[in-house]
């Protein structure tokens, strides 16, 4: 399976290396698809020929606007995920879009005593799990399952 990641940077506060983001996302998606635990992915499409994810980095104002519009929350957030799970006749799969506010990620990293990239890895894993159908706001058990998967992913990303 080929994985394509589109990265768009629409903010200028925090410098984000697109190549590193692409590499991390590919590792996360590959781990989730190649793991022996087939319950990890809620996607019913098995072995798509080509998988696409879009990642857009935005500033505080745009994130607040999107959070208000799509979640009814008038505040800045770190990440929003918009799953598509559209399977094209060609066998390609567009998982969806992840919108990230790097400034918020940076402040959370400081708060949790992590590096920017450690926190961004957690945010990327979280967003990809949302694209795969997980939702921590549905129930406590779903939230626990999602946190456990995030930890598995992060353990796999360590050098």
Swiss-Prot record:
Its EC number is 3.1.-.-. The keyword Zinc applies. It is found in: Cytoplasm. Binds 1 zinc ion. InterPro entries: MetalPrtase_cat_dom_sf_prd, YbeY, YbeY_CS. GO terms for cellular component: cytoplasm. It comes from the Bacteria. Its cofactor is Zn(2+). One of its GO terms (biological process) is rRNA processing. Zn(2+) binds at residues 126, 130, 136. Keywords: Cytoplasm, Endonuclease, Hydrolase, Metal-binding, Nuclease, Ribosome biogenesis, rRNA processing, Zinc. The keyword Cytoplasm applies. GO terms for molecular function: metalloendopeptidase activity; RNA endonuclease activity; zinc ion binding. Its main location: cytoplasm. Belongs to the endoribonuclease YbeY family. PANTHER family: ENDORIBONUCLEASE YBEY, CHLOROPLASTIC (PTHR46986:SF1). NCBIfam families: rRNA maturation RNase YbeY. Single strand-specific metallo-endoribonuclease involved in late-stage 70S ribosome quality control and in maturation of the 3' terminus of the 16S rRNA. This is Endoribonuclease YbeY. It comes from Thermodesulfovibrio yellowstonii (strain ATCC 51303 / DSM 11347 / YP87). The gene is ybeY.
């Amino acid at each position: 399976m080929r994985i394509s990641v589109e990265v768009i940077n629409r903010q200028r506060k925090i410098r984000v290396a697109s190549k590193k983001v692409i590499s991390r996302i590919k590792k996360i998606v590959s781990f989730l698809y190649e793991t022996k635990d087939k319950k990890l992915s809620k996607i019913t499409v098995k072995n798509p020929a080509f998988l696409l994810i879009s990642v857009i980095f935005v500033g505080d104002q745009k994130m607040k606007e999107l959070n208000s519009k799509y979640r009814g929350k008038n505040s800045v957030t770190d990440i929003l995920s918009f799953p598509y799970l559209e399977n094209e006749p060609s066998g390609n799969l567009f998982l969806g879009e992840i919108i990230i506010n790097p400034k918020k990620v940076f402040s959370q990293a400081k708060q949790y005593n992590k590096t920017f990239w450690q926190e961004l890895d957690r945010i990327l894993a979280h967003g990809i799990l949302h694209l795969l159908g997980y939702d921590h706001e549905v129930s406590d058990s779903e939230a626990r399952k999602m946190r456990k998967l995030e930890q598995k992913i992060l353990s796999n990303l360590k050098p």
